[in-house]
Amino acid sequence: SFSLAEAMHQEIKAVTDKPVKLVINENGQGHAMLGNSYWAELGIDILAHEAAIDEVKDNGYQILEEMKRYNREKADGTAVITANISFSEKYVFTLGGIKFEILHLGDAHGPGDTQVWIPQWSLMIAGDIAFHERMLPIFENTCTRCWIETWKTSFAPLNPLYIIPGHGHPTNLPQVEKY
């Protein structure tokens, strides 16, 4: 939501005076995109996979209305805003001498699942392709066969030393493979 993105921004400001340069939507679900209105208001670019953008265009207003039903006070100021930058397979940029590879490794948890791979640190910000300390949720648009195939052929071969899962604490590959 707008207020959650604003609170996150305050946390960022508490540890650095550097500006936010880019916001990456990990997929098209509400928890990933309902804060876009805050970042867009600040003029910050928002990146998402093209399938996540389609998901927001197709279902964003319904997702926002559902959020308002259970969390009305935290929905104030929230609007459905799609990412202004899209990618299909990979988006690469360097910031502060660090190379970031924004990846869509394949279908998994939901439309447009996105990962951030930082090769020099062997760090994967996995998004919702990886869970830790909880059961994987299966939704109507989840392709479990695709998820397993994407994991085996694209995610696991990267062999990240560190993984920040979509849900759960930072961990490693053997731990997320349990879930």
What are these regions (language model features)?
Residues 1-2, 92, 99-179:
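Metallo-beta-lactamase
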Residues 3-6, 10-85, 89-92, 111:
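Active-site HxH/HxHxD metal-binding segment of metal-dependent hydrolases
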Residues 19-21, 97, 136:
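Short, basic, glycine/proline-bearing loop/turn elements
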